[in-house]
Curated annotation (Swiss-Prot):
Record's protein name: Ribosome maturation factor RimP
Subcellular location: Cytoplasm
UniProt xrefs under Pfam families: DUF150_C (PF17384), RimP_N (PF02576)
Function statement: Required for maturation of 30S ribosomal subunits.
Entry keyword Cytoplasm: yes
């Protein structure tokens, strides 16, 4: 269902100058919550941007009726530190510092340099490039440096 929602609202969000990072539908305290997270290629995602996007996509979601039950719509930034789960997440996080944990228990910190549908390339501290297929990644998390 979230894939259909992404397809419906992704173009609308892009027409406003932002990028759709993720859509998730969760149940919290017996209430369905639809979370839409954004990336602003020109800077931060402000509260005004979240409100603007929410006001535009809310009626669209109501008309499409993808979610049968009542739900709360939450629109937010993708966050400074987040787990990368899909090729899209990797592509939208190029140039960021990440902590990488592999399925073979190896771990390292690097800069995410490239990503495609099968793998991601990481630049290590010695400037070497390490290419890893997604299937070999256990967890990749962006790191925010103060």
């Amino acid at each position: 269902m979230t894939k259909k929602i992404e397809e419906k609202i992704g173009g609308v969000i892009e027409s406003l100058g932002y990028l759709l990072y993720d859509v998730s539908l969760v149940k919290e305290n017996e209430q369905h919550v639809l979370r839409v997270s954004l990336k602003n290629p020109n800077g931060a995602v402000s509260l005004d941007i979240c409100q603007q996007v929410s006001e535009i996509i809310s009626p669209l979601l109501d008309v499409c009726d993808f979610i049968q039950d009542a739900y709360i719509l939450e629109v937010s930034s993708m966050g400074l530190e987040r787990t990368l789960k899909t090729p899209k997440h990797f592509k939208l996080s190029l140039g960021e510092k990440v902590e990488v944990k592999l399925t073979n228990k190896e771990s390292f910190q690097a800069v995410l340099k490239d990503a495609n549908d099968l793998s991601a390339d990481f630049e290590l501290e010695d400037h070497a490039i390490k290419s890893v297929e997604y299937k070999d990644l256990k967890k990749v998390k962006t790191l925010f440096e103060w």
